[in-house]
Amino acid sequence: MKNKSLICLFLSIAAFSSCEQKITSTKADVLSEYKGDYEIVFMDWTTTEKNINTVDLDNNGCGSNDLMSELLGLPNRFPVSKSRFVQKNERGTLFFYLPVVDYFTDPGIKGISPTISVATVEIPLHLTVNEQGVVESDLFTQLDWPDENRIGLKNLSDIKIIKASPDRIDIEVGHYLVYDYATQKLIDGSVKIWLSRM
């Protein structure tokens, strides 16, 4: 009887230990499904500015909310870099490559010079899995750029993943500055971005 009790005790401990290992490995397993490359499919730009619903970024006379098509319509096209997710145990980082229109102040001209220059910046978004098994990211608040004249980059902030699955990652950029040729002014807006697995 005593031996039977000991066997039951050992089996209980083994089962508990196995359960603990399963919980620990599950978070790592969830993240491992995201490993690989992603590309931007769509960038939906919106603003709270009154009477502005679209933006004419490429100066063709037609406004759009599709920021990706506006960027691709610029004369100096930029290489769209693929984003990549890498994992280390139960944490991972999505190295998110975001195209940003960079504007420069011109000392000889009052205000800004709407020189079209598109930079691709790397945003490291750190991913974890919460207790409900949902993938979350930290809020990336602000890029620290030493060049005070780079207006577009200075105003890029509040970036986070709002929804994630292994085949699609949705990212929101809280502040994304654009120069609208229709109104001839800088407009602060937000962008929802769809990343698709390559």
What are these language model-derived features?
Residues 2-3, 16-44, 195-198:
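Bacterial Sec-dependent N-terminal signal peptides
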Residues 155-159, 164-198:
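Edge beta-strand at a domain terminus
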Residues 73-168, 196:
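Contiguous, well-ordered beta-strand patches that form the walls/edges
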Residues 35, 39-98, 143-156, 179-180, ...:
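Short, solvent-exposed loop/hinge segments that bridge or flank secondary-structure elements
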